[in-house]
Amino acid sequence: MEAFGGFVMDEQAIQVENVFLEFLKSFRLDANKPELYYEAEIEAIRGGESTMMYIDFSHVMGFNDALQKAIADEYLRFEPYLRNACKRFVIEMNPSFISDDTPNKDINVSFYNLPFTKRLRELTTAEIGKLVSVTGVVTRTSEVRPELLYGTFKCLDCGSVIKNVEQQFKYTQPTICVSPTCLNRARWALLRQESKFADWQRVRMQETSKEIPAGSLPRSLDVILRHEIVEQARAGDTVIFTGTVVVIPDISALAAPGERAECRRDSSQQKSSTAGHEGVQGLKALGVRDLSYRLAFIANSVQIADGSRNTDMRNRQNDSNEDDQQQFTAEELDEIQQMRNTPDYFNKLVGSMAPTVFGHQDIKRAVLLMLLGGVHKTTHEGINLRGDINVCIVGDPSCAKSQFLKYTAGIVPRSVYTSGKSSSAAGLTATVAKEPETGEFCIEAGALMLADNGICCIDEFDKMDIKDQVAIHEAMEQQTISITKAGIQATLNARTSILAAANPVGGRYDKSKPLKYNVNLPPAILSRFDLVYVMIDDPDEVTDYHIAHHIVRVHQKHEAALSPEFTTVQLKRYIAYAKTLKPKLSPEARKLLVESYVALRRGDTTPGTRVAYRMTVRQLEALIRLSEAIARSHLEILVKPSHVLLAVRLLKTSVISVESGDIDLSEYQDANGDNMDDTDDIENPVDGEEDQQNGAAEPASATADNGAAAQKLVISEEEYDRITQALVIRLRQHEETVNKDSSELPGIRQKELIRWFIDQQNEKKKYSSQEQVKLDIKKLRAIIESLVCKEGHLIVLANEQEEAAEAEETKKKSSQRDERILAVAPNYVIE
């Protein structure tokens, strides 16, 4: 249809142009109102200095069925005429829009809201040239470059100028010079200042995980964006592209090693029987005779697939988490207020989270607050303060950790689910790849970039390699990803919340050890989580019955077995509305936050307390974020003290302590013999008068104690740790003193160590009777035996009674143990 820059007349296309112009000049949403619907588009184009007119395709379908069928079936053919109709409409309605300075200014047409949205696998050669919508996930975006639309060429032989040569998806020169005396066909110079260029961007789109058939790999497709819709699709967005399918040469296939078949005619072998069918290698005559083609998609509109398909297309650039409450209708706002006014609505919101999982209310509450998030802030220096909440779930196998992650990834519009074992550092953050067509390096988004302004769920977090864990340090706190490689230096945004699940070391959580010994994660990463929850699979008859009953009901009745107070749609809408609020701290809440943080720090330094990790300023910031999220859940614009108290309780239940069992030391008291008569060697700290009064009752007391020895010796884990720490510190102090003069062994006799501890407790007025002293001596002997035989924290340096007679050893077994010299194991580190 092109000849020397002109076009052959297409009667049907001209008819489509006229009917489309009539549609623009006469369409009204309300027949009773005089104003034209698309006349407002002209004002929007003028106000935003735009060149794009957005057309709702449902309006075209309601106006003229023949017109919508022609556009849908042969869009690529009629697209220049539709653009011309838009330009004529703008000039007729506003003649001053096209000024003398820009006589060639075009108005581009963009369709949206098509009745059907196809999957990527449904795009076949039958769709070439048709107007279709396709949905997928953006995985890669190129930089914006200028594209030559209409070229102006100068003949190098005669100097003639040929204008408006349309480019057919490749660099297209005139076929022959317009001068009748010039026969030039190949020697041309492009006049760039007189040619027409447009912004151009290539986007790689991939199938969503829900659309991939079983056993298949996800397919991808290149999408070409032009004019104003460039930079509207970001990596990680699930988008709806509207446009047409075209066929372009597959350059990467031609550039690969090996021969590629081309169909060409060789004049030197015209008489040969094989003429015209020889294989030719390389990129010669690209796009003309090569046989390797692939599909591409030229889009004219971009929509974010978040359920709001009828939103204003022009507000896409500002469509982040801004407080835009105008996106909710009056009915939706009424429904949100009804949910807010429901009695005990916060617990009902929590109960509606992950209804297939029984119990775990604290974790559901943490996930809800993570979805709501805190408020992002920026300091005067331009430093961003994180508002997203990170949550880590550590638990035994089969505790529904992955169910929480799957549910969270499904309820959030922008989310990524990945596994830590199969994820590398580049796969989580970003990688630098080479463009196959240009050879230039570009950045390809990883999981954290794809989840920007969303949530990244990482399963098997503890299985990641150390070098891969280090890569997400910056992303978890500063929420940026810095890349310096292959000549590219960039800082990318990763404003995402991280929900991680990890298994404890050895498969089961050991309550007798702190969290840092139970999970294979460094303290630097643990401190970046606002909430760390531990799920322990303890046998409990009542709980096990309810869990089994719930699971069987779900398998039997499916959705009918679940009866959450609020549906998933209502929950999504409530969370979306709550995120538009930006609550501020009240003076009372600010004061309570400071007091709570000081109390947490005080508890962190108290000897004998068990904490998951050190209380730092990060935990104070976590309290602020949690308080803001709780205020959002209540639809409050002010953080109250009650919100802070709930945040403190959540932090305490998550990181301060884990319900730990008592320690049974019965086997070690049996090993010691534990005859209370052996305490004679240890000085009695209680007054002598009490000793005389109790002297007559000594035989009976000994008999009673022998009976008590048969009982179990059980102490709490906190007491065990407190006594252990005191003994180790005393031994270390003595070791440092001995090392200075080196005149004696760097250890303390066991009975002297016990006597020192009893004296220390007596100075604090801990004892009121002789029985308490004897009980503590029994505990100390059992704990020391455990530290020597089981834990290995203490070692025996010498025992002066080793060479005593065997009978004497049997008679005074406990006394012999009291004579041994103890020291701290060299590899033991005090917590």
From Swiss-Prot:
Mind telling me which CDD domains this protein's record contains?
A: MCM6
**What is this enzyme's catalytic activity, as reactions?**
ATP + H2O = ADP + phosphate + H(+)
Please note every region of biased composition (Acidic residues). 675-692
Start-end of Basic and acidic residues biased regions? 259-268
Question: Which tissues express it?
Answer: Expressed in shoot apex and flower buds.
What's its EC?
Answer: 3.6.4.12
Positions bound to ATP:
G395, D396, P397, S398, C399, A400, K401, S402
Q: Which residues form the MCM domain?
A: 345-551
- Role according to the record: Probable component of the MCM2-7 complex (MCM complex) that may function as a DNA helicase and which is essential to undergo a single round of replication initiation and elongation per cell cycle in eukaryotic cells.
UniProt-recorded name of the protein = DNA replication licensing factor MCM6
Give the organism the record lists: Arabidopsis thaliana
Taxonomy of the source species: Eukaryota, Viridiplantae, Streptophyta, Embryophyta, Tracheophyta
**Gene encoding the protein:** MCM6
